[in-house]
């Protein structure tokens, strides 16, 4: 059997179905296939990919902090600050879920305050960032955080391609939901089998 990297190189770019099929065939995690594809497309090694991905989130993580620290949005007011004051576990009775909600809305509010970057106002980076920030709060290690970020971006990028080719806005919470579902499966050690 050919090595994974050479097979991925032949098929670039990979669909999600191809990504899952290769993970199953080679007995690796889906994120390992995503990272292999990223290494080939960027020329970076795995650590370089993980570092670069987290650097892309720096702006939105700053937006989250503004959003939960009194940021005020023309659309959402001060909802994240109010959620923070209520404390985790009060909306869904689940700390991680409450934090993910709070930080997702905080990313939106913060971006309304400081300007939207790198997204074009489509909303998909806000759920990704909210979920990552919640994972940070519950003590998820840096490597796992970066792997989750890569996986969410892979799923989200497929929605962006669909938007470009169909003209339909498939991003926003649609991409966010699918990306976070994939990330949750990864975090729970789910497999393609």
Language-model segment annotations:
Residues 2-177, 188-193:
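N-terminal core-entry segment
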Residues 183:
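N-terminal Rossmann-like FAD-binding beta1-loop-alpha1 element of flavoenzymes
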């Amino acid at each position: 059997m050919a090595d994974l990297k050479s097979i991925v190189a032949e098929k670039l770019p990979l669909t999600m179905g191809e990504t899952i099929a290769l993970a199953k065939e080679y007995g690796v995690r889906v994120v390992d296939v995503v990272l292999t594809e990223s290494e080939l497309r960027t020329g970076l090694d795995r650590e370089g990919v993980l570092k670069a991905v987290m650097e892309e989130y720096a702006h939105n993580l700053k937006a989250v902090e503004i959003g939960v620290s009194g940021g005020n949005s023309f659309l959402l007011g001060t909802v994240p600050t109010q959620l923070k004051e209520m404390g985790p576990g009060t909306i869904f009775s689940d700390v991680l879920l409450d934090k993910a909600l709070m930080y997702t809305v905080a990313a939106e509010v913060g971006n309304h305050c400081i300007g939207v970057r790198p997204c074009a106002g489509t909303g998909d980076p806000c759920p990704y960032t909210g979920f990552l920030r919640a994972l940070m709060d519950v003590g998820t290690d840096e490597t796992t955080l970066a792997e989750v970020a890569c996986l969410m971006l892979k799923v989200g990028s497929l929605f962006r391609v669909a938007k470009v080719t169909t003209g339909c806005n498939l991003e926003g919470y649609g991409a966010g939901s699918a990306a976070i579902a994939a990330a949750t499966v990864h975090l729970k050690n789910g497999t393609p089998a």
